């Protein structure tokens, strides 16, 4: 698939044709979810945030809006939508959820469900000062180009773990966020 010419219709048809298989065992019992917000444009964008440097975990990292599934959340999808509203003021009613990717285990002990949703191009994002220092949009075609991601093997507690690294403008995209973007690319048939 040629990533440079990716339209929203191309993305949607490929995502719908290749629905993710979600059959995974996990050791992580705490649940979390992130929203992968794809901005509806002729050449779609991918909305990302940079976490506040004042946070205890993952300070300053590029991330999708998201967080832990609360008792008040009916599902992982509900949690992703709630967190997106809290972090960047995306109203849940403005998100067209098109599916989920297979859950990912985080190094902090969560099983994270990536929720893919389409959002309008004219939303007035408002970053939560406590949680988010920046909100930015990356062209989806660039984000899904697998050649931009570089592997790094990390050894932690006797286990090897591969993380992916990339830059977009001044933003360093790595770890779980880069891994989820790569999984999205592979899901729609982008070849490594």
From Swiss-Prot:
Q: What is the lineage of its organism?
A: Bacteria, Pseudomonadati, Pseudomonadota, Gammaproteobacteria, Enterobacterales
Origin species: Escherichia coli (strain K12)
All copies of the Nudix hydrolase domain together span 29-160
Top-rank EC class of the record's enzyme: hydrolase
Protein name in the entry: Uncharacterized Nudix hydrolase NudL
HAMAP family for this protein: Nudix_NudL
The protein's role, per its UniProt record: Probably mediates the hydrolysis of some nucleoside diphosphate derivatives.
What keywords does the record list, in alphabetical order? Hydrolase, Magnesium, Manganese, Metal-binding
Molecular function GO terms recorded? coenzyme A diphosphatase activity; hydrolase activity, acting on acid anhydrides, in phosphorus-containing anhydrides; magnesium ion binding; manganese ion binding
Q: Which gene encodes it?
A: nudL
């Amino acid at each position: 698939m040629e990533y440079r010419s990716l339209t929203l219709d191309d993305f949607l048809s490929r995502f719908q044709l290749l629905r993710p298989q979600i059959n995974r065992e996990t050791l992580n019992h705490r649940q979390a979810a992130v929203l992968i917000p794809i901005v509806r444009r002729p050449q779609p964008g991918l909305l990302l945030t940079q976490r506040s440097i004042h946070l205890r975990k993952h300070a300053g990292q590029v991330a999708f809006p998201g967080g832990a599934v609360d008792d008040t959340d009916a599902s992982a999808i509900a949690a992703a939508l709630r967190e997106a509203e809290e972090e960047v003021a995306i109203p849940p009613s403005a998100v067209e959820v098109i599916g989920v990717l297979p859950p990912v285990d985080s190094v902090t002990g969560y099983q994270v469900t990536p929720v893919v949703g389409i959002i309008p191009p004219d939303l007035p994002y408002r970053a939560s000062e406590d949680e988010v220092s920046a909100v930015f949009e990356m062209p989806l075609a660039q984000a899904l180009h697998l050649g931009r991601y570089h592997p790094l093997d990390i050894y932690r507690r006797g286990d090897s773990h591969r993380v992916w690294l990339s830059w977009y403008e001044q933003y360093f995209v790595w770890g779980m966020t880069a891994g989820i973007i790569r999984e999205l690319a592979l899901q729609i048939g982008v070849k490594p």
